[in-house]
Design a protein with these regions (language model features):
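Buried hydrophobic positions in well-ordered alpha/beta secondary-structure cores of metabolic enzymes
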Residues: 4-6, 60, 72, 90, ...
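Flexible, glycine-rich active-site loops centered on histidine and acidic residues
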Residues: 124-157
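Short glycine-rich or small-residue beta-strand-to-loop segments that form or flank ligand, phosphate
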Residues: 70-78, 104, 229-230
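Short beta-strand segments
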Residues: 75, 131-137, 159-160, 170, ...
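Phosphate/pyrophosphate-binding loops at sites that engage ATP/ADP/AMP, CoA/4′-phosphopantetheine
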Residues: 56-70, 210-225, 246-249
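Condensing-enzyme catalytic core mediating Claisen C-C bond formation in acyl metabolism
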Residues: 1-47, 145-202, 206, 210-213
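Acidic, glycine-rich active-site loops and adjacent beta-strand->loop/helix elements
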Residues: 1, 75-81, 107-112, 135-140, ...
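Conserved catalytic cysteine-centered active-site region
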Residues: 30-34, 39-50, 78-130, 241-261
Length: 261
């Protein structure tokens, strides 16, 4: 059996009220008022994705012996260093053994799940020791944009191994498509955003349900047997839309924390 053996998280204390931001910029972008609910987390001036990753990892590893960690994977699209291994800095801050293998993963917002997949593949291959997975984001957005209300700052961490498993890994399915709902070119500070309906209609009504259905079929799991369905939704109500298309009951939909992170 392989899977997650412990977990941790870090969410900055500071908050940006979506209502306050929307009201301040509604004169230029009235559409912001539709997203003026809840708040998002906001990193302080001395925080970035690396410092948040360290805090999440410390939360996950609290009270544990770290000598058995054999690898560290750090997923983010906002690594502070372009040519200096960020994962190595996380390992140093955690005082992990110098003999561990460390890797940065980026290039897309699925960097965190890519890091988790790499750790699970490592465990499935029977490699010795646990793998530490950290994911963190500190994304910048244009002032007055919808993304300013959506891009919360936070980090999560997991250890993956084959003993003392608290969440068994049953399987996965991946779909690799060059879907351009947004992008950020090298050297650019902000994302270039395309029509948001394109994201909803093409990605969340087509590609995401296809991946979920394929994963369930591969593992021979009835969609109605799912008790917890968690989707990283950029805007509200997408979880219900995807769950319905996948045959997952509405009662299984978990809070995406969109309203507080």
């Amino acid at each position: 059996m392989i899977g997650i053996t412990c977990y941790g998280a870090y969410v900055p204390r500071l908050r940006l009220s979506r209502a306050a931001a929307a009201q301040a910029n509604a004169w230029a972008n009235p559409g912001l008022l539709a997203q003026a609910r809840g708040e998002r987390s906001m990193a302080n001036w001395d925080e970035d994705s690396l410092t948040m990753a360290v805090e999440a990892a410390r939360d996950a590893l609290a009270g544990r012996n770290t000598d058995g960690i054999g690898a560290l994977y750090f997923g983010s699209t906002t690594h502070p260093f372009a040519d200096r291994q960020n994962a190595g800095l996380v390992a140093a801050a955690l005082d992990l053994p110098e003999s561990i293998s460390s890797s940065d993963l980026g290039g897309a917002q699925k960097a965190g799940t890519s890091a988790l997949n790499a750790a699970l593949d490592r465990a499935a291959a029977g490699r010795p020791g646990e793998a530490l997975v950290v994911a963190a984001e500190h994304r910048r957005a244009r002032p007055g944009s919808a993304q300013e209300l959506q891009y919360g700052d936070a980090a999560a961490a997991f250890t993956v191994g084959s003993s003392a498993v608290i969440a068994e890994f049953l399987g996965s399915h991946s779909v690799s498509v060059d879907f351009v709902d947004h992008y950020r070119a090298t050297g650019q500070e902000f994302d270039y955003i395309w029509e948001e309906r394109w994201l909803r209609d093409e990605a969340f009504q087509k590609w995401v349900p296809a991946a979920v259905k394929a994963a369930l079929e591969k593992m021979e799991i009835d969609p109605e047997a799912i008790h917890h369905f968690v989707l990283a939704e950029p805007v509200a109500k997408l979880s219900a839309l995807v769950a319905k298309r996948c045959g997952i009951t509405e009662t299984a939909i978990a809070d995406s924390l969109l309203g507080v992170v």
